[in-house]
Amino acid sequence: MKRLELRAKQIRQMSKEERQETLKNLKESLLHERALISMGGSSPSPGKVRGIRRQIARLLTVEREEKR
């Protein structure tokens, strides 16, 4: 599954519901990737976990910015 990189500008343009849905999907993807790795296999793309974690961080950062 190819995932587009979300930039902060794109995230800010999303509605709160869209951000929550995207965050949920990213966390599920991260869980899936970590499960593959823990079962002894290696991820087809080693940088994928790092990319997913960064996207989650971007989403959470924008969420916290909007709370201020």
From Swiss-Prot:
The record's Pfam families line, in alphabetical order, gives:
Ribosomal_L29
Which Gene Ontology biological process is one annotated for this entry?
translation
Signal peptide positions on this chain: none
Q: Which UniProt keywords apply?
A: Ribonucleoprotein, Ribosomal protein
Q: Name one GO molecular function term.
A: structural constituent of ribosome
InterPro entries from the xrefs?
A: Ribosomal_uL29, Ribosomal_uL29_CS, Ribosomal_uL29_sf
Cellular component GO terms, alphabetically? Answer: ribonucleoprotein complex; ribosome
UniProt keyword annotation of Cell division present: no
The text of the family note is:
Belongs to the universal ribosomal protein uL29 family.
Name recorded for this polypeptide: Large ribosomal subunit protein uL29
